[in-house]
Amino acid sequence: MKSPLELERYFVSDQAVTARHVFSPEKDIETRVEEYSVSNEAIRLPAVEDQSEKWQVTVHIKHQPATETNFPYDFRLTIVGIFRCAIEKAEPSHIERLMKINGSSILYGMSREIIRANTERGPWSGIVIPTYSFYEPKPNNESPPEESTAV
């Protein structure tokens, strides 16, 4: 089965990793959910003749620990992917949802490895950021298709 979502290319548009001088390797590492943020967006690109629909998906990741939090690094990363949608005759809202959930998930997985690789080169051990779900339930105004009954 061919995937309805194809990643054409991706790039990191913003990235910074800072080793924190206040980190104490003798103490346990602290992680606070409120110090970690993830956001995403999906934008349909202008159509080009004889090509399937393209979308730009962007994922922003940021970890900014408070001074008293014992964590080895603060970091931020923005990754952008250009995706092609192979689904024909689909509702635009369904394609946008596919891009926001699946496209963002693909980019987030890549981001986890980029952040791990960059922190591995720092003075403290490398970190692997937590997994993240971009799933959002369908809005209430989108009802599932009705089942047809044969007569």
Per-region residue spans from a language model:
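N-terminal intrinsically disordered, cationic/polar leader segments
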Residues: M1-I106, E113-V151
